[in-house]
């Protein structure tokens, strides 16, 4: 997967917009958000995407993001926080409650490093965002070599990140997939981050300028003579 759209169930998205996203050339979708999450909204958004054969990932930040019919679940582990609630606390409580029913083969964990101090997710998780490139690289190595996480996700959450930092991270990961998300608002920015990240995630621009969002997926289309 090279490109994913991230959709927030707390935000309104017309059916025709969803159809355009499905046929844009993207490789799939993440459904996830930070606040005002309700199970009905998650179900409605999942149903809107039902016409696609593309993978749909539910990013589980609380119980409202759990749909039994979903095929793919992402479990975020926030690495740059000292609040254990977001590294393993909530995870343990959900496992304690639902452990006998969890479809483990449909679950993928992702090591998050959140880098925009003004983002809701940074404030919620108490993320330490004032990091050097060396700090970020250390977290990448921690994710791959200590925790053996399949995904390392650098999240600037609404703010376009530093391509040089992203490049440096890409050079130290070999087995763990490198995902980048944050502030991609043009196909040029998408192409820049795609040079380094295995997968780019495009989110906010969907709700600001749908056509520009669609353009970010076109850079991966194979050219025909």
From Swiss-Prot:
Taxon lineage: Bacteria, Bacillati, Bacillota, Bacilli, Bacillales
Cofactor(s) this protein requires: Mg(2+)
Name of the protein in its database record: Heptaprenylglyceryl phosphate synthase
GO MF annotation terms: heptaprenylglyceryl phosphate synthase activity; magnesium ion binding
CDD domains: PcrB_like
Subunit structure: Homodimer.
Gene3D superfamilies: FMN-linked oxidoreductases (3.20.20.390)
Catalyzed reaction equations: sn-glycerol 1-phosphate + all-trans-heptaprenyl diphosphate = 3-heptaprenyl-sn-glycero-1-phosphate + diphosphate
